[in-house]
Regions:
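Hydrophobic residues in well-ordered beta-strands that form the structural core
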Residues: 2, 70, 94-96
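Glycine-centered, small-residue-biased loops immediately flanking beta-strands
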Residues: 66-67, 144
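Helix-to-beta-strand junctions that scaffold the AdoMet/dcAdoMet cofactor pocket
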Residues: 62-64
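Adenosine-nucleotide cofactor-binding segment
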Residues: 1-57
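Residues in the short beta-alpha loop(s) of Rossmann-like NAD(P)-binding domains
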Residues: 5-6, 74, 100
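C-terminal hydrophobic helical "lid"/dimerization subdomain
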Residues: 56-60, 101-153
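Conserved catalytic-site loops of classical short-chain dehydrogenases/reductases
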Residues: 44, 67-68
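Rossmann-fold NAD(P)-binding glycine/threonine-rich loop
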Residues: 73-91, 107-109
């Protein structure tokens, strides 16, 4: 299941294999997850945004035994009120993530194996002379991943 406010990103997520794509701005994310799974929540949540709203939504999607992976890079000083009772009652596992020396090689191996499709997520390409445009595009909600190189026109 994918939670994403931008329509084009939801569409790409569905193309890449998400069973459902939910708009967390206009839909009740927790209610949709419960309806789609037919149970109390999901087994694993990967939070990739880093803001307190997305983090709260991530924890609201949990059930007993869920693992919550906080994969995002939040702003320095960001805090989140966490119900320790929920952690206890639901037996949640909370995992932080940071890049490690093996990460890049594992990513390359996944790409080379064909298990990861890059084409749908490489949405824009810019020549080096248009670096400023590339940065602005990456900051917008119109892009997923932006490439900059000497071979792009």
């Amino acid at each position: 299941l994918l939670s994403e406010p931008v329509q084009t990103r939801r569409e790409i997520g569905l193309q890449l294999g998400a069973n459902a794509a939910i708009d967390p701005i206009h839909e009740d994310l927790t209610a949709r997850i419960r309806a789609l799974t037919g149970m109390d929540g999901v087994d694993v949540v990967i939070e990739c945004v880093g803001n307190t709203i997305a983090t709260a939504q991530a924890f609201s999607a949990t059930k007993r035994g869920t693992t919550v992976l906080l994969f995002s890079v939040p702003k320095s000083g960001t805090t989140h009120p966490l119900s320790l009772e929920d952690v206890y009652q639901k037996e949640l596992t909370i995992v932080g993530s940071i890049i490690n020396p093996d990460t890049h090689q594992r990513a390359v191996d996944l790409i080379n194996s064909g298990r990861i499709q890059l084409a749908p997520i490489l949405t824009h390409r810019f020549p080096i002379e248009r670096l400023k445009d590339a940065i602005l595009m990456q900051m917008s909600s119109e892009s997923l991943k932006v490439l900059v190189g000497s071979n792009y026109d």
